[in-house]
C-alpha cells in the first residue's frame, strides 16, 4: 500500500488515524478497535467490511 495514501486516509467512524498492518493487509483504528481490509493495495474503508480487533490486538 502506498504510504502517501496512508497519510491522508482516516477512519470512517471516528475520523482518527489508521495504522497499516502489512502482515494482515489491514488498516487498524485503535480507538474503535476495527481493522479495515486492504485488497489489491486498495483500502476498503466501509464499516460493514471491518472486523473487530481481538482483545490481544487491541491491547498488545
From Swiss-Prot:
Xref: SUPFAM superfamilies: Trm112p-like
Q: Which InterPro entries match?
A: Trm112-like (IPR005651)
A GO cellular component annotation in the UniProt record: cytosol
Q: What Pfam family is a match, any one?
A: Trm112p
Listed PANTHER family: PROTEIN PREY, MITOCHONDRIAL, ZGC:162634
User: According to its UniProt record, which protein family does this protein belong to?
Assistant: Belongs to the UPF0434 family.
In terms of HAMAP family, this protein maps to: UPF0434
Q: What is this protein called?
A: UPF0434 protein ETA_21370
Q: Lineage of this protein's species?
A: Bacteria, Pseudomonadati, Pseudomonadota, Gammaproteobacteria, Enterobacterales
